[in-house]
């Protein structure tokens, strides 16, 4: 499994309070996956074209589906479970049963593998945040 990373306090851009972002799924204690999926979407919406929790795919305590369109205009259907996130389809609201894609512990890791433009947007957002911290420290 590849190395996951967690952004340094991008929470101010995503609208979440400090400490509320998903670092992984261990200890989630079978939380409502729709709530988890909404948090995932809000955390990285700045770095993709479109991303939303599916309204037509079944949601349960242990699974939710997220549709994402990358900045490269590639569409994916993602499955969110206690195991993590994985691609299950290459169109919105589509599950291709034959796919054997790996699970990713974080949305950052998954998008990093799917979208070079995500990496660039993430890097730019991180740089802006660091520059803001530097300015605040010099005041």
UniProtKB/Swiss-Prot annotation:
Phosphorylated by GSK3B. GO terms for cellular component: cytoplasm; nucleus; perinuclear region of cytoplasm. InterPro entries: GSKIP, GSKIP_dom, GSKIP_dom_sf. One of its GO terms (molecular function) is protein kinase inhibitor activity. Disruption phenotype: Knockout Gskip mice die at birth. At 18.5 dpc, embryos are still alive but rapidly die within 5 to 30 minutes after casarean section. Embryos obtained at 18.5 dpc are cyanotic, suffer from respiratory distress, and fail to initiate breathing properly. The record marks 130 as: Required for GSK3B interaction. The keyword Ribonucleoprotein does not apply. Belongs to the GSKIP family. PANTHER family: GSK3B-INTERACTING PROTEIN. A-kinase anchoring protein for GSK3B and PKA that regulates or facilitates their kinase activity towards their targets. The ternary complex enhances Wnt-induced signaling by facilitating the GSK3B- and PKA-induced phosphorylation of beta-catenin leading to beta-catenin degradation and stabilization respectively. Upon cAMP activation, the ternary complex contributes to neuroprotection against oxidative stress-induced apoptosis by facilitating the PKA-induced phosphorylation of DML1 and PKA-induced inactivation of GSK3B. This is GSK3B-interacting protein. It comes from Mus musculus. The lineage of its organism: Eukaryota, Metazoa, Chordata, Craniata, Vertebrata.
